[in-house]
């Protein structure tokens, strides 16, 4: 939609809104429904090397395994929407394997999910920045496509250290929790594109995140409640919100 387009890692997106990796992307049909909606990109549900059934409640990593999603990708090509393949490994080698497979399968951006509480980088909700760096370094060396790193919530004092590690290995996109935008944006200082996730349910939320430095936002809970039509609604609200702020400026 005019005025709402953006770029992530130099890739043009028709809209700054997209789904979060766990929302409306778990079956073969749901990514197709997203591709036909007003979303700016289709984020495939976080994949692991093998199927995970009855994973730890709330961890978000229950999935049928990456081969299932690789089979979905071919059907999405015709839609023309950029594809983000989200991956989670339990070793650095698994992250490399998963990212490489998506890089070979027409995925424009690979998202490294380092935020889930059962992955080694964030075991029990405590982020190990040395482990984060080991993963991003290995994947960057093996994968030529743009990389987005989804980080867990961090203490404010740790944000600068995390950003330094991402910059060191030429990561293109940082995905952070929306409440931490005010901390991440100045630390990144434009070196990486910033994407917000969490708590975006209307145009006002989206405008707030974008005005605090995000180039795009991911929508999860609102999408699950309303379905893919949520993107058109939030887009219209975002346009109205921008008009209000432009008038009052």
What is the role of each PLM region?
Residues 20-22, 151, 197:
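Short His-Asn-centered micro-motif
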Residues 65, 189, 227-230:
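Glycine-centered helix-coil hinge/cap
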Residues 1-83, 88-90, 234:
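N-terminal capping/small domains of soluble enzymes
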Residues 200:
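Short donor-sugar binding/catalytic loops of nucleotide-sugar-dependent glycosyltransferases
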Residues 77-80, 106, 140-143, 188, ...:
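Structural signal for hydrophobic packing residues in well-ordered secondary-structure cores
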Residues 52-57, 210, 216, 221-249:
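C-terminal helical cap(s) of enzyme catalytic domains, especially alpha/beta-barrels
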Residues 32-37, 41, 90-195, 203-219:
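Alpha/beta enzyme core
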Residues 46-49, 178-179, 221-224:
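Short, acidic/turn-prone active-site loops that include or flank metal/cofactor-
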């Amino acid at each position: 939609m005019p005025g709402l387009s953006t770029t992530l890692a130099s890739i043009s997106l028709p809209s700054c809104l997209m789904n979060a990796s766990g929302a409306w992307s778990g079956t073969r049909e749901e990514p197709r429904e997203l591709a036909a909606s007003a979303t700016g990109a289709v984020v495939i549900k976080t994949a692991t090397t093998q199927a995970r059934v009855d994973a730890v409640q709330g961890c978000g990593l229950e999935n049928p395994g990456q081969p299932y999603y690789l089979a979905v990708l071919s059907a999405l090509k015709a839609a023309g929407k950029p594809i983000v393949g989200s991956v989670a490994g339990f070793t650095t080698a698994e992250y490399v394997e998963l990212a490489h497979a998506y890089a070979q399968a027409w995925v424009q951006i690979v998202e490294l999910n380092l935020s889930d509480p059962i992955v080694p980088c964030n075991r029990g909700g405590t982020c190990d920045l040395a482990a984060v760096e080991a993963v991003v370094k290995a994947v960057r060396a093996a994968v030529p496509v743009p990389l987005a790193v989804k980080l867990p919530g961090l203490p404010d004092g740790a944000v600068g250290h995390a950003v330094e590690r991402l910059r060191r290995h030429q990561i293109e996109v940082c995905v952070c929790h929306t409440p931490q935008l005010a901390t991440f944006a100045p630390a990144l200082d434009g070196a990486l594109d910033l994407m917000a996730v969490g708590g975006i349910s209307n145009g006002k939320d989206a405008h707030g995140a974008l005005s605090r430095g995000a180039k795009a936002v991911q929508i999860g809970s609102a999408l699950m409640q309303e379905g893919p039509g949520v993107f058109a609604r939030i887009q219209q609200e975002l346009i109205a919100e921008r008009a209000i702020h432009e008038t009052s400026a």
